[in-house]
A protein has these predicted regions:
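A glycine-rich, often tryptophan-bearing local segment used as a flexible ligand/cofactor-contacting loop or short
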Residues: 12, 16-112
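Catalytic beta-strand/loop cores that center a nucleophilic Ser/Cys/Thr
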Residues: 6, 78, 82-171
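Solvent-exposed, acidic/flexible segments
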Residues: 3, 16-24, 188-192
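Structural motif
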Residues: 9-13, 177
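Aromatic-Pro/Gly-enriched surface loop or interdomain linker
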Residues: 1-8, 199
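Catalytic-core region of carbohydrate-active enzymes that cleave or remodel glycosidic bonds
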Residues: 196
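Glycine-rich phosphate/pyrophosphate-binding beta-alpha loops
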Residues: 179-185
């Protein structure tokens, strides 16, 4: 993680990591300087720091779950990416997702050339933090093909957004987050174009 000292972008595909303090320090320093971040799928719950004496314990995904007044509620996921792990949304491996691009965001550079976005990975429940701009809502489908019918009992939820974070103290940084991004999702041309544009 020392490469973050000079990195132009941090792209995350993480889940429940517990890095030593000296490794986490590189991530925190990068965030403090306002480095841009792209977070995919399980990165909403990137850290599960179990050591009670860890310097960066507040970055754990469920920080403040038992104390809503805690500093940095929801940890890295909520405070940096815009949402932490809440739950699966739909039945994983039997329901897929169609991404519905938001008409008022179609001129955003991340959506340039993006169409027909479908993700094989199941959805996540998400309600992005205030200040986030939703680019796409997820429509859960009853099946594992792009032409599967919508699941009638599932409302559309945010699945891709951008925002600006700011550490205290620190500089503001840009973020793109999607609750999709499993390897098979990248096989879809529309999803792949969105991912490329976000970087």
């Amino acid at each position: 993680l020392e490469a973050l000292k000079t990195a132009d972008l941090l792209v995350l595909f993480l889940r429940f990591q517990d890095f030593p303090d000296e490794e986490m320090q590189h991530i925190v320093d990068y965030l403090d300087r306002g480095g841009p971040v792209v977070g995919y799928r399980t990165s909403t719950h990137a850290f599960q720091i179990k050591r009670p004496d860890a310097k960066f314990l507040k970055y754990t995904w469920n920080n403040g779950a038992k104390n809503p007044a805690a500093d940095f509620p929801g940890g890295f996921g909520r405070q940096i990416l815009g949402e932490t792990w809440v739950s699966h949304y739909g039945r994983n491996h039997t329901q897929s997702s169609r991404l519905l691009l938001q008409p008022d965001q179609m001129n955003h550079p991340i959506l340039r050339g993006v169409k027909d976005v479908w993700a094989q990975s199941g959805g996540y429940t998400a309600d992005p933090i205030a200040g986030s701009t939703v680019l796409a809502l997820g429509q859960i489908l009853d099946g594992m093909t792009a032409d599967s019918p919508p699941a009638g009992d599932k409302k559309q939820v945010p699945v891709a957004w951008y925002r600006t974070y700011e550490q205290t103290p620190g500089k503001p940084g840009r973020v793109f987050t999607t609750t999709h991004g499993a390897s098979e999702d990248l096989l879809n041309d529309g999803f792949r174009r969105m991912a490329v544009n976000a970087t």
